[in-house]
């Protein structure tokens, strides 16, 4: 029974991924989320920029939490990844962190709450592909000698 549910969820997730592709981001990254806001009869897209402090859930229930400081107050918002309210996510900068959940940022203010920028902005898959290509070139060079 659960396999059927997982299969249906995977199909729905793939269908949504076709329409809009989200970047590969993780906690510590600064993201700009395009959110569809309905005010009365009008709908518009509003940008919500902040630090992703957590990702949780799996499948269609996956969500991420974004924290920003607005007029001196910390504001956190949880976005479901596959929600129609989320128009898109733009990766502003990658952060260098060693935790999956950055809830400790809630207690920090000012410079203490800053996250260092990651120097290598490539994703893990891109780094591994480059490493494999370098190893292949090295093997070809050794075979030629």
UniProtKB/Swiss-Prot annotation:
GO cellular component: cytosolic large ribosomal subunit
A single MF term (Gene Ontology): structural constituent of ribosome
Residue pairs linked by disulfide bridges in the UniProt entry: none
UniProt keywords, alphabetically: Ribonucleoprotein, Ribosomal protein
GO annotation, biological process: translation
PROSITE patterns given in the database record: RIBOSOMAL_L19
Pfam families referenced in this protein's UniProt entry, alphabetically: Ribosomal_L19
Family statement: Belongs to the bacterial ribosomal protein bL19 family.
HAMAP family assigned: Ribosomal_bL19 (MF_00402)
Family annotation (PANTHER family): LARGE RIBOSOMAL SUBUNIT PROTEIN BL19M, RIBOSOMAL PROTEIN L19
Functional summary from the UniProt entry: This protein is located at the 30S-50S ribosomal subunit interface and may play a role in the structure and function of the aminoacyl-tRNA binding site.
Name this protein carries in UniProt: Large ribosomal subunit protein bL19
Organism of origin: Brucella anthropi (strain ATCC 49188 / DSM 6882 / CCUG 24695 / JCM 21032 / LMG 3331 / NBRC 15819 / NCTC 12168 / Alc 37) (Ochrobactrum anthropi)
Lineage: Bacteria, Pseudomonadati, Pseudomonadota, Alphaproteobacteria, Hyphomicrobiales
Gene designation per UniProt: rplS
């Amino acid at each position: 029974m659960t396999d059927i549910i997982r299969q249906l969820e995977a199909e729905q997730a793939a269908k949504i991924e076709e329409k809009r592709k989200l970047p590969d981001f993780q906690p510590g990254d600064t993201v700009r989320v395009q959110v569809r806001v309905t005010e009365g009869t009008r709908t518009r897209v509003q940008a919500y920029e902040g630090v992703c402090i957590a990702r949780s859930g799996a499948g269609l229930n996956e969500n991420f939490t974004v924290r920003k400081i607005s007029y001196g107050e910390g504001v956190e918002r949880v976005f479901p990844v596959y929600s129609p309210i989320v128009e898109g996510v733009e990766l502003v900068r990658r952060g260098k962190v060693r935790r999956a959940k950055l809830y400790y940022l809630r207690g920090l203010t000012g410079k203490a709450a800053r996250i260092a920028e990651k120097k290598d902005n490539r994703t893990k898959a891109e780094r591994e592909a480059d490493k494999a290509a370098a190893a292949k070139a090295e093997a070809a060079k050794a075979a030629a000698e």
